[in-house]
């Protein structure tokens, strides 16, 4: 599923707004992770969608934020979902600038949006897709034989 499909078809993203990186909404979402630490180079994966309330990013100055976004681009992170109103009510302009410059979609959701709901709504279709592939492979193996 792409970010665009996720935003249009998923009720858990009701009230979401794309505020930067609009040109990259065709990226495929392969997994989802809550951003708790800025050492993304140690755990980030291509196609990962990051959920955050800005907690891990608030300690970064502009230069370290730039490095964080460079690492996100290198890894292939598909986007960031930021819960506004929990820790911050306004996004620092340099964050939006980096998202646009490094082509990383920045999506805001209301503070009432629950991480659990977003994570489940992303992982359920991904798991169904994986199970379908596994079932297809099993049928093929059954037909071909061992």
Each language-model region and where it sits:
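Alpha-helical/coil-rich non-catalytic "connector" segments in signaling and regulatory proteins
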Residues: 1-146
């Amino acid at each position: 599923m792409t970010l665009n499909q996720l935003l249009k078809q998923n009720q858990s993203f009701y009230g979401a707004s794309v505020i930067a990186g609009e040109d990259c909404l065709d990226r495929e979402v392969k997994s989802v992770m809550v951003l708790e630490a800025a050492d993304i180079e140690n755990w980030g994966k291509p196609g990962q969608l990051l959920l955050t309330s800005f907690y891990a990013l608030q300690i970064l100055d502009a230069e370290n934020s730039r490095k964080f976004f460079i690492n996100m681009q290198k890894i292939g992170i598909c986007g960031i979902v930021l819960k506004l109103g929990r820790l911050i009510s306004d996004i620092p302009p340099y964050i939006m600038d980096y998202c646009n410059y490094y082509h990383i979609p920045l999506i805001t959701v209301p503070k009432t949006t629950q991480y659990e709901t977003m994570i489940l709504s992303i992982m359920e279709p991904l798991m169904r897709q994986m199970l379908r592939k596994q079932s297809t492979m099993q049928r093929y193996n059954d037909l071909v034989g061992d």
